[in-house]
Amino acid sequence: LMKILLGVFIPLIIIIIILILLFVFRRRIPCLRALFTYKLPKTSTDLPPPIPIENFAANLKELSDKNGFHDLSQEMALLTITEVEDKYRLTKVAALQNGSRNRHNDMVPYDQSMVLVGRPWSTVLKDQEPRITVREVEKGYINASYVRRSEYGRRGEVLVSPFTTLPEYIAAQDPLESTVADFLTMVCEQRCPLIIMLSGHEEGGTEKCAQYWPGKETQTFTSENYSVVVRKESEESSGNVISRQLSIHPLGETSPWTVTQYQFMDWADHDVPDMESFYNLVIIHNKFLAKHHMGNEYGPTVVHCSNGAGKTGTFMVACFLLDRLRKNQQNVDIVGTVLATRKWRANLVQSWAQLQFLYNFIDFCIVRENLSGKSVTIRLPAASARKKKIPVIPFAF
C-alpha cells in the first residue's frame, strides 16, 4: 500500500512543484528574453498585420472613413512596449533628478538607449550596452536617445533590433538655454554629420528651441560642465528648409567638428506638415547620408523637436518606412514600425494625426516613386503652408 501511495503522491508533488515554478517565473521569462531579442507584446487588441501594397489604398480609405486612426492610436498606447520598465527605473529617476535639463519632465530617455555626454561615438562602437554609473549621469545627462532601425521577419512583420545594432539616429529634445553647450558637445562627441531641426525658435510666443548657432559669425556657449565655440560657415534657404554649415569647437579639443543642419520651417505644433515639402526633406536627408556613411568617421544623425518624440518620431519612422518600401514592395507595417521604434524612446509618433500622416506619406510615396499599388487621396488638416507648391530642394551635397 505504501508503495502505491508513494507511486501516486510523488509524481503529483513533482507536478505541483513544476506548476508553482512556472507560475512564479512566467513573468520573468519575457524580461530575460528582452535582453537579447524583443518581439512586440501580445494584447487583447487586434492590431493590423503588415498591409499588402496592393491593398494599401483601400486600407487607408477604410481607416479614414471610420475615424480609425484615433482608435488605432489609442490601442497602440495600451500596448506594454516597455515590458521591462523596471530596468529603466534608474534612467527615469536620474532624469528627474536632472529635471532642470529636461524641457518636459514627462518625456525622458530610457536607460538602454540614453546618450551620455562624455561617452563618445568611438566608445559606442565598441560597447552598445555599457554599465552606466550615477556619477556619469550626473555630469553627462542630456535628454537624448539612440534610436535603432527595425528588422523584419519572413512575413514582413517588424522585429526590434538588438542592442548590438548601431543606432542610426539620436532623438533629442530642443536644447534649453542652459543645455546648448551640452547639446553641441554631444554632436561633436557622437560625430554627427547632420542635424534635422523640426521646430522654430518660437511658436505662439513660447520658446521652442534655444538658438545653438551664432547670429553672425562666431559665438561661445557655456553650460555648467561644457564650453563650446561655434562658427557659422554658411547659411542658405530653399523652399521650407534652411541649410546651415556649423563649425563646433569644444573647449580642450584640438580641432573643430563640422556639421550640417537642416531646419524645417513647415511644421507647426499640433499640425502635420505639407506632404510635398516633408517628402523633399526626407530626400535631401537621404542624399546627404548617402555620402556620409555611418561608421568610424561619422555617427548618427540628430533629429530634434520640442520634446524629441512627436515630430522627431514621425520623421524617423517615415524614413524607415520609405527605405523598407523601396527594398520590399510586398507589404508595409506602419503600426509595427512605430511600436518597435518606441522601444528606444517613449511616445515616438505622439498623436493620432501623426499616425495618419504616416499612412498618407506611404500612400504619397507609392505614387510619387511609381511603386506597386493604387493610391487614394485623403484630405489632410488645413494649414496655410499647404496652399503653395514646394519645389524640390536643390541643395548641393
Give the positions of each predicted feature.
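Cys-based phosphatases of the PTP/DUSP/CDC25 superfamily and their flanking regulatory architecture
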Residues: 1-397
